[in-house]
Amino acid sequence: MSRRNRTKKYTPLIIIMLITVAAVLGVAYYVLKDDLYFLQERTVSPDGNITLYIKHTVSGDSSRYRVSQRTDGNKLRYYEWTTDKLETVWADDSSKCAIRYTTGSGNEVTDVLDCVSGKIIQASSMSSLSLRYYMTQTGYELYDEIPVDLKFTGWQGDCMCYKFSTVNTSGIELSGNFDADYSNGFAIKQFVRD
């Protein structure tokens, strides 16, 4: 049998195999496209010496972020967060990075990554913090421990800057901002009314 005849003989079989493979791949893509994918991105520190690699994976209803750090080309470690959205905000001196995300219950959380040691050094739920409010009324000093919803707005030196709005125990609406020292359990450094 000549080469041309052999080619003609197997051509229908090859076509059928290609169609079958294409169909299987098409079905697999249709089934899995909404259940599993990942997006790799990165963020570089202001001084350019530290790179964080962010891998976003979605499987079914679960959205997960994995952040790994590299310094001088060496991969140190990684951390994972289950959330639909994750943001990173570098400190001016590049030594720390705030990792901001929202939990499944809707609480905004800010973790602090120490980029020198590669460790998470502070984790705080924004809805669990309280603010001690001072005012003078008829000669008395009143102190209220007020649960507040804080929004992280950025770094100022070693302090993390937050805006807040809340109502104290006397029903007075409060809003403003303060700087919190990440190394001392978010001690209030400054209280400013808007």
In which residue ranges do the predicted regions lie?
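Terminal domain-start segments
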Residues: T20-W81, G176-F191
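Short glycine/acidic-enriched loop and turn motifs that connect beta-strands
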Residues: T57-G60, T102-N107, V167-G171
